[in-house]
């Protein structure tokens, strides 16, 4: 029951994702970070198959870092999105990745931006996006309450509404969510919304 969503505010972008690592009927952990920090000013939220998600997002992160190392310049958000789309499209014809992506970034000349990319490499620049079962409710809430000029506080309030709606409407809802923000100061973790915590397993004596 994965849920990943993001939206663009006045001078920032936010990505939120559930933190459950599940397989079939089993929950392996509830603190899995599904939002990769690609570089100082880019975030990539991903959902779907756990192995594909982890491998593909790390592959993109390392290639973005390689480009910066070789050229001494950061990729723009649009360039990173198109590179990611190209890699997904290439893999689609060989060994496809089952991964859906929301890529957010901040560029000094254009400001914040958000890109929606599905597992068949369809790419769109959007103001708001969501994947997973929670997207049915998150998109409805964002359609109703979203404005392009929202402040950070207003967006966080909307994100909390989306999380509460997901928790109340899904039969097996993810308990915890992680929120990350990106603005001119860079990409960083903003907040957790937790209803349960993973306790450390005691060591047998």
Predicted feature descriptions by range:
Residues 1-205:
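Long, low-complexity N-terminal extensions
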């Amino acid at each position: 029951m994965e849920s990943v969503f993001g939206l663009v505010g006045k001078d920032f972008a936010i990505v939120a994702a559930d933190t459950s690592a599940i397989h079939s009927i089993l929950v392996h952990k509830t603190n899995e970070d599904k939002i990769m920090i690609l570089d100082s000013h880019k975030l990539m939220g991903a959902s779907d198959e756990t192995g594909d998600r982890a491998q593909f997002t790390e592959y993109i992160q390392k290639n973005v870092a390689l480009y910066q190392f070789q050229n001494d310049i950061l990729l723009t958000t649009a360039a990173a999105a198109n590179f990611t789309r190209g890699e997904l499209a290439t893999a689609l014809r060989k060994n496809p990745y089952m991964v859906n992506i929301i890529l957010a970034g901040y560029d000094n000349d254009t400001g914040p931006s958000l890109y929606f990319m599905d597992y068949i490499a369809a790419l769109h620049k959007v103001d708001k996006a969501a994947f997973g079962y929670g997207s049915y409710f998150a998109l409805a809430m964002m359609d109703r309450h979203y404005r392009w000029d929202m402040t950070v506080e207003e967006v966080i309030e909307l994100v909390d509404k989306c999380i509460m709606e997901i928790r109340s409407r899904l039969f097996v809802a993810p308990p915890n969510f992680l929120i990350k923000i990106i603005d001119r100061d860079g990409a960083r973790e903003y907040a957790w919304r937790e209803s349960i915590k993973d306790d450390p397993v005691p060591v047998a004596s």
